[in-house]
Amino acid sequence: GVRLESQSWGADHAPEVDYTGSSMVEVVKGAECIRYGFGAMGGVVLLNDAPLPYDSTRFHVKGSVNAGYDTNARGVSGSGTLEAGYKRWGMRVHGNYTKGGDYHTADYILNNTGYNNIALSAMLGYKDKNITATLLSSIYYQRSGIYYGSKISDLDQLIKRFEAGRPDVSTLRNFSYDIQPPFQQSQHFTVKGEVKWRINDDHQLDIVGSFQENLRQEFENRKKQQWSWIPMQDLILKTYKFDVTWNAKWHLWNMTTETGLANTYQENFNYPGTKQPAFVPNFAALSMGGFTLHKAQWGKLQAALGLRYDFRVMSVNGYTSLSNYTYYDDFKLYSNFTSSLAAHYQISDQWDARANVGWSWRPPDINELYAIGLQEGSYWVVGNRHLESERGYKAVLGTKWRNTKFSVEPSMFYQRIDSYIYDHIGNGKDRYHNHPSGKYPKFIYDQDDVRLVGGDIEATYKPIEPLTLVAKGEWIFGRNLSRQDWLPFMPSDRYGLSASYTKVLGNRQQYVASLSLSGIYVAKQTRFDPDKDLVPDSPDAYFLLNGTADFAIKLPHKREIKFMLVGDNVLNTLYKEYTDRFRYYAHERGANFSLRTLIRF
């Protein structure tokens, strides 16, 4: 795959990615994160495409169709994939469409929260004994509404809204698919070419080049209705990437080496005519890096060492205000090393242990430096041009024990970050911002030295072959060492318990039925400072019950029909998530039931 480059500075900016077009999800942790540059040492999630159908002696076509309906927001969705292969050639085309209207919490509707998404992609490939070449092109469009009830012009009313934590009943309307200002829309185009050259049995060279273009427009309510259809933000981001990677195998100690160079050039431009200062300025940025990842094995011990150097240079210019035309022209240069050492030891057939320690850094993002404006339609953001790079280290320890019926896997981590970048609610006069569309809480970027400590545990039990029980727990403690208080907006403790049952039926085992039920309990967050929040208390603890039932019919020639019923928050719990900034205005989504049909042919 290729790293998505978009205007990802908004918590409400969903990644412009069609998840239905990816057949494999890969989670990368440990020393292997060194491949993906600064900011990736915590782990990387990859959405990978399945290999194209090469080597068919005759022209062969197969595909799939997926259709679904969601009760919450009355959403409809449909996707289809068609792929063909003949000898050394393979191709795949994919399309997806989703549409939904206003969604409901457990108690009330949230108007103007509809969405429309359209995605198209095509992939062509060639493969012979030594060369594999692919060309991928995709386009993704999304339009999503923003709940308008966060527009409140009176400060006393805004504070009362925070205390109530839910909309005024008089502002609620009937369900609709219409999307009116405030809303946002974006379009993302990607083209990627990749060549894998198998030099010999032990050496391979990978070359990847890509271009991405991201268009984003954001609309807000203005004084006059006709002005509301003029975008407040109108941006285009262009990204050019070129990566080269060499992979080698060595016969001594089963060693492997992966060495690569990564180059990225970006240009961001704000179209004029918005009558509003740009949220992020115009900029050009060049990032270059080189890495090496070396692995070896000595009996039961496996080890990996990764080293990387990156630098990033940015040229920035923009206006902080249109009223006095305050212009700035800035230049930033960041560089540093990243390293990681990982080990895995097989103590016995049933027990293994792993450890990883890494030193990493991250330069501030463009929004953290220069942002000024409304985000998520609900709070005002102010960047900090004086931010430095984050630097720190992280140590992870874990182990796993298993037998034929039971397994348990605990892990823990300790992380120290100097100059950690985060945003917090302003104090005094900086607590709220007065804007023509309303009054909003103000979040200001800052940095301090912090410590993060946490862990998780997962236990799996199979009392009988078709039944699997899984229990999980997750904890994280974030402490601000510079100010000697808790870090704001850190996740609460989470606990989960799930059960899944799968049964193969029929004389020819052509039917597969499965049921799963899962419960998630999220504790009340007590590790926070009430004086540095907009409300004096954190949301209550909550419990969510989810379930899935599906029935598959296997047909000749690897064809299949599957029916699925998925339930989220089936008890229709009214709850809030502590880390969600929108919790000051409303609750999370209520119950949703999805009915889906998948046909493979």
Question: What residue ranges belong to the model's regions?
Answer:
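Short strand-turn segments of transmembrane beta-barrel domains in outer membranes
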Residues: V44, D49-A84, G95, L110
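Outer membrane beta-barrel strand-and-loop segments of large Gram-negative receptors
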Residues: Q233-T245, G289, V382-E388, K394, ...
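Face-selective signature of the C-terminal outer-membrane beta-barrel domain
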Residues: K127-Y141, F175-N324, Y328-S340, H344-Q346, ...
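Surface-exposed extracellular loop regions of Gram-negative outer-membrane beta-barrel proteins
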Residues: S150, Y265-F269, F311-L322, F331, ...
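Short acidic/polar hinge/loop motifs at secondary-structure boundaries
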Residues: R3-K29
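Periplasmic-side early beta-strands and strand-to-turn transitions of outer-membrane beta-barrels
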Residues: L46, T81-P181
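C-terminal beta-signal and adjacent terminal beta-strands/loops
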Residues: W361-R362, R416-D418, D423, L469, ...
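Gram-negative outer-membrane beta-barrel transporters
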Residues: F413-R416, H435-Q525
